[in-house]
Amino acid sequence: MKKGRLYNRQEIEIISKSAIGKSVNDILNEEVVTIENEVSPNKGGLGQLVEQFLFGIQTNNDSEPDFMPAGIELKVTPYKKLKDGRLSAKERLVLNIIDYMNEYKNEFNSSHFWFKNNTIQLLWYLWEPNKDNKDLKITHEKLFELAKSEDLKQIEEDWKYIIKKIKSGKAHELSEADTMYLGACTKGENSSSLREQPFSKIKAMQRAFCFKTSYMTQLVRKYIGDYSNVEKVLKGTTNTFNEFINNIVDKYKGKTQKELMSEFGLESNAKNINNMLISRMFNVKSKLAETEEFQKAKIIPKTIRIEENGRIKESISFPYFKYTEIVKQDWEECDLKEELETTKYMFFVFKMENGEYVFKGIKLWNMPEIDIETSVMEMWKKTYNTIKSGNIVKSIENGIRKTNFVGMSENNVCHVRPHGRDAKDTCKLPVPDKLTGANEYTKHCFWINNTYIRKIFEEYL
C-alpha cells in the first residue's frame, strides 16, 4: 500500500529512480488499474497522474510540501528536443500561489515560498508532439535543494523584489520579466482572476511564484543535456547579478567607444564590434546572450546609440508571425504576450558627444504589465481580427497596397510592419484576403514604436 505524503527522503529517491524509463501507462499496468476507474478523464495533467499512481498522492492545493514530514515538494515537468538537437524546457515550473495579504510579512527563510519549495523532487519527462500524455516517458530525476544551489542568492533577490513591489502597493504591476530566475507568473484562467492586495485598493492578477522557462531550460541542459561549454558571467564572485552590473558601469562609464576598443584590443573595422565590446566589458569570450546567467534569466543584450539631437537609431522588432498560427491563439496564451512578459532587455547606452560615442550606462528593462495589457493587447487583437476576417488589404493605390494592420500612429506602444525580404516573401493566409483574393501575403511582424523606445531612455537624453 502506498504511503502517499508520508514517504521519507530515501523512499522518495528510490521510487523516483524506479520511474525512469516508464510512462504513466507503464506505471498503471504495474498497478493493474486503469485511468478510467481512478481518475476523471477531464481532470489533471501528466503530473497529477504520476503523483497519484506512483506515490499515491491525491490532487490537492495544500499549503504544505507534498511529502510531509520529509519537507519535499514533488514536481513533474516536461522538456523537449529542438530542431537543432538542443534540449529546452517546455514550460515554466509553477510553484505556489503568491498570497499578497500575508507573504510580505515574512523574511525569505521563513516565507511560505521557502517552506513549500526549498527542496523539490523533480521528475522530467520528454514531451513529444502527437503523442498521448500517458505514453510520454519519465527520463530523469533530480532532488533540487535550494539551500545548496549556486542560484540561491539570486533567487532570494528575486523573491525580495516581488515582495518589495507588493509592499509598494504595486502587486497589479508585477510582471514575470521583473526578475531573473524566480518569477511571478499569472495564475488564473484569464485577466478576471483578480485578488486584493494589502497596500492598494487596486485588485491584482492572481500570480504564482515560478521558475522561469529560461531558468528551467538551463537546468534541463545542466542535468540532462550537454552543459560543458556554457560560459558564466559571475566567476569567482559573491556579488549578485545587479551588483556585478553596477561594478561594470562604475568601471567603464564615461569612456568613449574608441577608448574601450583600445582597452580591449579590438579593431574598429571588426564585425559586430558592439557585441564584442559588451562581451569584453563582462569579461566573457562568448556572446553575452549565450552566457549562463543571460540564458537563465532570458535577458537580451542590445546596444543603444543616442545621437546628439536625441535621436535613437535602434528599433525593437520580433520574428515574423505566421498568419495561420496567430488565428489559433487567444490573447492570454499568445506568443507575443508570452515573449513580452518573460523577456528582459539589457541596454548598453552610448551617446554621441563631440563626435564620439560615450558609454553612459546599462539599463535593465522589461515592458510594464500595464502597457502589455492595454496597448499591446489592443494591437494584437486588431491584428488577429484583421487576419481572421480576411480584411488585410484596405486599398491599392498606384500599385501600392495599404493594409488594415495597426500603424505606428494608431498605437502608442507598438505596430505591425512588413518583415519579408520583398513582396514575394510570403506566408499562407488562413482565409483569402477579401479585396485581392490572395491566399498568401507578405510576411509581417510586431514592432515596438521608436517613440516608445525613446521614452525608456529619457534620463540619458
Language model features by range: what are they?
Residues 1-461:
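Nucleic-acid endonuclease domains
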